[in-house]
């Protein structure tokens, strides 16, 4: 059975605190008619620190889309190998044992995808399949896990490497002065992550079922306007209330699996902002403690897009992991409005090969019943 192993996380060395963010907002937007509202909204995020791929002075000085994308490519090639090596070590796998690389990022563009460079530069086989995901935004972390799960169900002896590279600060647009844009300037951070999904064995979350849901007629709630100056992030004021629509999706998937949300042991969800976590507590009738890892990611890193779920999961591992067979859920939320959800149980020690194959045969026989 496919197991999501311990993620590797990296953040850039340049740090900006909430106080520095507030001071910059006061100075930069001194005459803005809604400046005080923006300052309150930034404070309410609870984001205390964020990491940036460039010093704040370079981040604020927009050099143009071409230069920014060059920075994206150079920094990705500099920083990705280290998290890939650590993720492989965490899963006790070698590059030659990886059959698919899923690369997720919504903050820069490359063609060919960085997957080609990773394969050529880090000892992966030329036959390694590539799956770049560029347009699912913050939902892409959950989507990557689910597509890796699907692949391992189809090819039970395979291993999948997931890589997330998000330099959100490269999307800063000084001319965007709407309340939503100014709030985003104090919310998003930069990070990289990688994790291996093993088809057999491994310690971590055994992936048992996954599902996807698109909220109808909400595609303009979270979007990019692509202009000469790059990606302009657009956030509708209705976005903070989306958990009222998505919480039932989580409940339904868990119920379909024969489990009950109140009896589950851990939750790793995309912490796009504090309202998401607060509303999930309310609509799922769960105590705030159940989302402590996602909350810590938001507080210490900000919204790091598709890397959020991996950073939060790494915190669960750092805390000793969960008990054997503990029941858990991972969910990513993003543009669409899209939810990508996975449920599974914790494996303290890797399953034996024979047992794993038996479970995989059960998955293939059951089809939807086990894989979403």
From Swiss-Prot:
Keywords: Acyltransferase, Melanin biosynthesis, Transferase. The keyword Acyltransferase applies. Pathway: Pigment biosynthesis; melanin biosynthesis. One of its GO terms (molecular function) is acyltransferase activity, transferring groups other than amino-acyl groups. GO terms for biological process: melanin biosynthetic process; polyketide biosynthetic process. Disruption phenotype: Cells lacking this gene are unable to produce melanin in hyphae, resulting in albino mycelium, however there is no effect on growth or morphological development. The active site is at 138. InterPro entries: Chalcone/stilbene_synt_C, Chalcone/stilbene_synt_N, Polyketide_synthase_type-III, Thiolase-like. It catalyses: 5 malonyl-CoA + 5 H(+) = naphthalene-1,3,6,8-tetrol + 5 CO2 + 5 CoA + H2O. Its EC number is 2.3.1.233. Belongs to the thiolase-like superfamily. Chalcone/stilbene synthases family. Involved in the biosynthesis of melanin but also various secondary metabolites containing a naphthoquinone ring. Catalyzes the iterative condensation of five CoA-linked malonyl units to form a pentaketide intermediate. THNS subsequently catalyzes the dual intramolecular Claisen and aldol condensations of this linear intermediate to produce the fused ring of 1,3,6,8-tetrahydroxynaphthalene (THN). PANTHER family: 1,3,6,8-TETRAHYDROXYNAPHTHALENE SYNTHASE, HYDROXYMETHYLGLUTARYL-COA SYNTHASE. Homodimer. This is 1,3,6,8-tetrahydroxynaphthalene synthase. It comes from Streptomyces griseus.
